[in-house]
Amino acid sequence: MRFRARVSQSTAKCVVFTGGGTGGHIFPGIAVFQALAQQAAVRVVWIGAARGADRSIVESAGLEFCGITAGKWRRYASVRNFFDVFRVLVGTVQSYCILRALRPQALFSKGGFVSVPPCIAAWLLRIPVVTHESDISPGLATRINARFADRILVSYPHTSCYFPRARRAAVHCTGNPVRQDFFSAQAERAYQFLRIDQKKPLLTVLGGSSGARDLNARVLSCSTFLTERFYLVHQFGAGNEDQMHTITNSLSVNARHAYMSFPFIQAHLPDILAASALVLSRAGANAVWECAVLGKPMILFPLERGSSRGDQIENAEYFSAHGAACILRAQDEKGHQLVSLLTELFHPSCARIEEMARASYTLGIGNAAYDIAQQLQTFIKEGM
């Protein structure tokens, strides 16, 4: 199998990372890898799903990658749950072989269904397990992994109450890790990349790594208003090109220079957010914490419970309760509330957006990636 060729190296220090299924489980792990690489000469190998985008994202960040068979336990009745039990078993055996060959000092899990087999295998091999949860309420994978973890890291102080009392001594609050690029972001680079001036404020719309069709539809419904008042950067998501073309075609020729669309923004995202006066976004953990690190006010459009387990609603409510964000729900299909809210926030006499920016910055203070790397360092030193 492919992973055998990738684990033949030997090293005095090694840490294995795991997580995947979506970018939300990978990018924070990459942030921790970057911080760890600055602190120590450690070999890092990532165990992720053999199928999907895990490999390309991880390898593009400079990490070794080992793919395993991944199963997923769904919260609803499905015949696929039966077959995925066997996929998890296969993935556990594969993970066991990888970890036995590598003999790492620790395993760091960033969650997602693919992380469960490596955590089980590490526990069987008595390799210390450190797991991190980005959302307020832990997902199913984190709840399972926590049973095998020596240390449970969380992003919000009150997340500890979701774990059994016997496990709470192992819980530590670190915040959510974001890439080091966000700490050195420069607005001027964004203006140069986008080829825009500063005559109008920049508004950035983020729909997550796969985009958000309903959020795109709201942009379409008020595209003329948005491009008249703002420069608009729109991450519309791969596969949603039809909506992007519809938005572009709805604009006058003169207005199109104010609309800049991308299927996905990665390398330039920190600079673009640094230049943004306001961010319209889903309420995924990565998005809200990346905005907070840069002190950006947010209008959040969380996924409803019918489309998720409710984690985005919880994230949005937390940032809203602390004054860093406003929430717009699915009922605002035509964008009327969005137009009204933007008009209010950017009225010359309104100080609310500055207050939101200060609140966002306060929440984003700290460097979770560095703190988590420090936690991993304790296991590396103990394992020497």
Swiss-Prot record:
InterPro entries: GlcNAc_MurG (IPR006009), Glyco_trans_28_C (IPR007235), GlycoTrans_28_N (IPR004276). It is a peripheral membrane protein. It comes from the Bacteria. It is found in: Cell inner membrane. Keywords: Cell cycle, Cell division, Cell inner membrane, Cell membrane, Cell shape, Cell wall biogenesis/degradation, Glycosyltransferase, Membrane, Peptidoglycan synthesis, Transferase. It holds the Pfam family Glyco_transf_28. One of its GO terms (biological process) is regulation of cell shape. GO terms for cellular component: plasma membrane. Its EC number is 2.4.1.227. It catalyses: di-trans,octa-cis-undecaprenyl diphospho-N-acetyl-alpha-D-muramoyl-L-alanyl-D-glutamyl-meso-2,6-diaminopimeloyl-D-alanyl-D-alanine + UDP-N-acetyl-alpha-D-glucosamine = di-trans,octa-cis-undecaprenyl diphospho-[N-acetyl-alpha-D-glucosaminyl-(1->4)]-N-acetyl-alpha-D-muramoyl-L-alanyl-D-glutamyl-meso-2,6-diaminopimeloyl-D-alanyl-D-alanine + UDP + H(+). One of its GO terms (molecular function) is undecaprenyldiphospho-muramoylpentapeptide beta-N-acetylglucosaminyltransferase activity. It is an enzyme of class 2 (transferase). UDP-N-acetyl-alpha-D-glucosamine binds at T22, G23, G24, R179, S209, Q312. Pathway: Cell wall biogenesis; peptidoglycan biosynthesis. Belongs to the glycosyltransferase 28 family. MurG subfamily. NCBIfam families: murG. Cell wall formation. Catalyzes the transfer of a GlcNAc subunit on undecaprenyl-pyrophosphoryl-MurNAc-pentapeptide (lipid intermediate I) to form undecaprenyl-pyrophosphoryl-MurNAc-(pentapeptide)GlcNAc (lipid intermediate II). This is UDP-N-acetylglucosamine--N-acetylmuramyl-(pentapeptide) pyrophosphoryl-undecaprenol N-acetylglucosamine transferase.
